[in-house]
């Protein structure tokens, strides 16, 4: 029985599962830890050309995805996934973070509405209480890549996906564990010396207390240099 189910609305259904069919996410998909279905918005398009967009009222550049077309596709998605939360990747949405990912997983049924063109009609957001979600302060061509990104993060958090679930607590942005919401320290493996660069001696000492102290201090230094706004919570 799957733990997470995602319904994806898109005009490019062939983009899924995409990268989610590989590595950890792909293995979890085959194990039925998560599942998905894709709905082609064009199946609900108008005229023989299956149009899904139209010109914007009030002028402006770009075309807008029509509310009647999106409404029909969302209604169909809700018939398959009735208790789902609906998310719309959008640059004006709440910024996606590790803590937001955990919050999203309180509902194991999710619908992702992948916009295209200039965006979607605002009335769709109002009608279905759609939650807008942003993956950063930049613009992409559509919502498919953000959806893949968000799902990859969510899937890693599901029980049974990682061989060692404790790995999560030692990663960047985790609120519990070694780095307390900061950035992860540098990582090292064999060989011990590479191009005259040596592994820090403390990591070879076998002294777990000193190693943990070193990791925490390195995390603090890296976080201060690269993401100082995270330190307020450390």
Swiss-Prot record:
Enzyme class: transferase
Localization: Cytoplasm
Pfam families in alphabetical order: tRNA_m1G_MT
Keywords: Cytoplasm, Methyltransferase, S-adenosyl-L-methionine, Transferase, tRNA processing
Residues noted as binding S-adenosyl-L-methionine in the record, renumbered to the chain: 115, 135-140
Transferase is among the record's keywords: yes
Entry's Gene Ontology BP terms: tRNA N1-guanine methylation
Gene Ontology CC annotations of this record: cytosol
Catalytic activity: guanosine(37) in tRNA + S-adenosyl-L-methionine = N(1)-methylguanosine(37) in tRNA + S-adenosyl-L-homocysteine + H(+)
EC number: 2.1.1.228
Molecular-function GO term, any one: tRNA (guanine(37)-N1)-methyltransferase activity
Family assignment from sequence similarity: Belongs to the RNA methyltransferase TrmD family.
Complex formation: Homodimer.
Role, per record: Specifically methylates guanosine-37 in various tRNAs.
Protein's name according to its UniProt entry: tRNA (guanine-N(1)-)-methyltransferase
Organism: Rickettsia felis (strain ATCC VR-1525 / URRWXCal2)
Taxon lineage: Bacteria, Pseudomonadati, Pseudomonadota, Alphaproteobacteria, Rickettsiales
Gene: trmD
């Amino acid at each position: 029985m799957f733990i997470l189910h995602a319904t994806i609305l898109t005009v490019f259904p062939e983009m899924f599962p995409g990268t989610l069919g590989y590595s950890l996410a792909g293995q979890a998909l085959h194990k039925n830890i998560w599942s998905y279905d894709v709905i082609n918005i064009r199946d609900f398009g108008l005229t023989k050309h299956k149009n899904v967009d139209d010109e914007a009222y009030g002028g402006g550049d770009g075309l807008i995805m029509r509310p009647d077309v999106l409404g029909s596709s969302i209604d169909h998605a809700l018939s398959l996934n009735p208790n789902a939360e609906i998310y719309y990747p959008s640059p004006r949405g709440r910024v996606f973070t590790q803590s937001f990912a955990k919050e999203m997983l309180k509902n194991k049924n999710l619908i992702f509405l992948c916009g295209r063109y200039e965006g979607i009609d605002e009335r769709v957001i109002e009608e279905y209480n759609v939650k807008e979600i942003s993956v950063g302060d930049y613009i992409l061509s559509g919502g498919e890549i953000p959806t893949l990104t968000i799902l990859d993060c969510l899937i890693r958090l599901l029980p049974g996906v990682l061989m060692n679930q404790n790995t999560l607590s030692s990663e960047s942005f985790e609120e519990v564990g070694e780095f307390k919401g900061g950035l992860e320290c540098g990582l090292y493996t064999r060989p011990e010396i590479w191009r005259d660069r040596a592994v820090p001696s403390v990591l070879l000492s076998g002294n777990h207390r000193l190693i943990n102290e070193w990791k925490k201090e390195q995390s603090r230094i890296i976080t201060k240099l690269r993401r100082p706004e995270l330190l307020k919570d450390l």
